[in-house]
Amino acid sequence: MGIQHEFDIIINGDIALRNLQLHRGDNYGCKLKIISNDYKKLKLRFVIRPDWSEIDEVKGLTVFANNYAVKVNKVDYTLYYVIYEAVIHLYNKKTEILIYSDDENELFKHYYPYISLNMISKKYKIKEENYSSPYIEHPLIPYRDYESMD
């Protein structure tokens, strides 16, 4: 069957992007397009629920916003999940965010999902699923302790 992690992103404790992992493999990531009309500070929580069947360690995450590296901090690590957090400041009307465990260009073109989040109209859309099955949960009702961003 192959290895498959679970990968979710929680944005400001209000929006959850679920199942961003690939159908198979040790990679996870996505491309986000965020539209906003004024300055916004977004707190992103990345939740990885690893499949330990074939690995000893979880790959780290890399985040770029409009081609600038974003600092990502590992905040929790258990047998059941690994949590990273990052803060992104939106200054432009349109912000492109790349989140990945492996930066191979082919993964962004054909495998990682592409999601559009319009913060003005509150319309959130999956533009391309590619080799994953993502969905958007809004408003978020945290059902796991680590999903709450208090």
Swiss-Prot record:
One of its GO terms (biological process) is viral process. Pfam families: Pox_C7_F8A. Keywords: Early protein. Induction: Expressed in the early phase of the viral replicative cycle. It comes from the Viruses. Plays a role for multiplication of the virus in different cell types. Belongs to the orthopoxvirus OPG027 family. This is Interferon antagonist OPG027.
